[in-house]
Every structure is written in structure tokens, then in C-alpha cells.
């Protein structure tokens, strides 16, 4: 599994705070910076499910598996690709809040692109189905 995370650092934002927000929900192996019209774009990447453990833990801690599953499932864009976004300000506080509308996050979202050989297994691992508040089926981590 390969994960790429893209987040904008606007001219009015502190880059270290944006990196802190990113690292609250993701463990990158490397972070690249690119200049853009709005400031800087940070591109973080890693391989393996370990880098998404913070995001998964936050989803479980908040008890939002069903909501997360719904949003992430809508982000399946190809047989091997899932794209979803979370609110940058919420991530700074260590909370996961999914962004479903383009302008929902005024400072721009944190956008995840996950490439995996099995999108269903990824979905069942990061946000498993629940029944009456209990996990119905928990898949092993994807490749």
C-alpha cells in the first residue's frame, strides 16, 4: 500500500502548525515542499499501513467507523485507489472530521490518496462495519 497526502500551507498559516496537524493523523516517511499560488504545498508519503495507524486510531477513539466508512467508500475512484480528505483545523486538535464539500475547509483540507491492491480490505481495516456500536468484521491490515 502506498499513501500520498497533500496539504496546502497558505501564506497566512504557520508551516510548523500545518505539519503538526498532518503528523497528528499521519506518520510520513518523507515530506516534500512545492511552491504554489496560495503558498506552499506539502506532499507527504509512505508505504505500508503503519503510517495510517494514527488516523485509524482516531476514527476508533471517536467511534465514527460508520461515518468514516461511508465517506471513504465514496472516495473509491479506481480498483486500486481511494481518495478522501479531512479538515486541517480538526486534525491540528487530533480529531478526524471528513471533508465532503470542496469549500468545507476554509484553509484547505488534508487530502489522502491511498493505492492498494484491495480497496475493500483497506476499507474493512480502517473503518470496519459495525452493528449496534460493535465491530461486525475487522479485516487484517492491507498490503
UniProtKB/Swiss-Prot annotation:
Q: Signal sequence: where?
A: none
Q: Which PANTHER family match?
A: UPF0201 PROTEIN TK1335
HAMAP family in UniProt:
UPF0201 (MF_01112)
Q: Which family does it belong to?
A: Belongs to the UPF0201 family.
**Under which name does UniProt file this protein?**
UPF0201 protein Pars_1985
Source species, please? Answer: Pyrobaculum arsenaticum (strain DSM 13514 / JCM 11321 / PZ6)
